[in-house]
Amino acid sequence: MYADRDLPGAGGLAVRVIPCLDVDDGRVVKGVNFENLRDAGDPVELAAVYDAEGADELTFLDVTASSSGRATMLEVVRRTAEQVFIPLTVGGGVRTVADVDSLLRAGADKVAVNTAAIACLDLLADMARQFGSQCIVLSVDARTVPVGSAPTPSGWEVTTHGGRRGTGMDAVQWAARGADLGVGEILLNSMDADGTKAGFDLALLRAVRAAVTVPVIASGGAGAVEHFAPAVAAGADAVLAASVFHFRELTIGQVKAALAAEGITVR
């Protein structure tokens, strides 16, 4: 049992369970396997299903936006906000303060920033100042520094373009810098664990948890209900998954039940 630990969900704030929808040109990718849906690739319809199943929040990531220069899908956000009333975070292709403004006006509650913040350090501070820290999420795609590359202090580096490009920036230091600049939470995605279904990167979570005081969302690696409580024990305030939910390998309810069985508070 984890309940006696000083960790999220142990008698404190409830740990959030967040499905992530990767969206390409307005369609959910990575596949979905819901029965009784008219269109299993429609993000709005999927969002409504997850809302009904008890998801605490939703995250939309435009997986093509940063690498191909597409603007984020405002119309999808508008349609979702009209039907779904849990918090919605949107990321992908967010480059300017104006982009954040457009997404918030369309109905997003929070906006995740990744590549653009690396290119312009002032951007996070400007966004937090204008819209409030609670609206700004720093998305960190971290991987173990490849053999032959210059090492970083923590052993992890920040990547961009869906993990395809290394930056040489230390991932833990970058998360801490983002918190200092005013972001309200860190979306920490392990590119090493992503897609493996072997569990979250607990060492990475512990390292970032020790470096920041803002909430941390664990992402990358979820494959079984047993994987979620250790992520919380390692410091996650929220747990995010995509394909295990989309393919019905796990449900929101099963994950919450597994967390509750370990003494972790859920909604």
UniProtKB/Swiss-Prot annotation:
The record's subcellular location field reads: Cytoplasm
Keyword terms:
Amino-acid biosynthesis, Cytoplasm, Histidine biosynthesis, Lyase
As its record notes, the protein acts as a catalyst of:
5-[(5-phospho-1-deoxy-D-ribulos-1-ylimino)methylamino]-1-(5-phospho-beta-D-ribosyl)imidazole-4-carboxamide + L-glutamine = D-erythro-1-(imidazol-4-yl)glycerol 3-phosphate + 5-amino-1-(5-phospho-beta-D-ribosyl)imidazole-4-carboxamide + L-glutamate + H(+)
Molecular function (GO) terms listed?
A: imidazoleglycerol-phosphate synthase activity; lyase activity
State its role. Answer: IGPS catalyzes the conversion of PRFAR and glutamine to IGP, AICAR and glutamate. The HisF subunit catalyzes the cyclization activity that produces IGP and AICAR from PRFAR using the ammonia provided by the HisH subunit.
**What NCBIfam families does the record tag this protein with?**
hisF
For this entry, the protein name equals Imidazole glycerol phosphate synthase subunit HisF
Q: Which organism is it from?
A: Mycobacterium bovis (strain ATCC BAA-935 / AF2122/97)
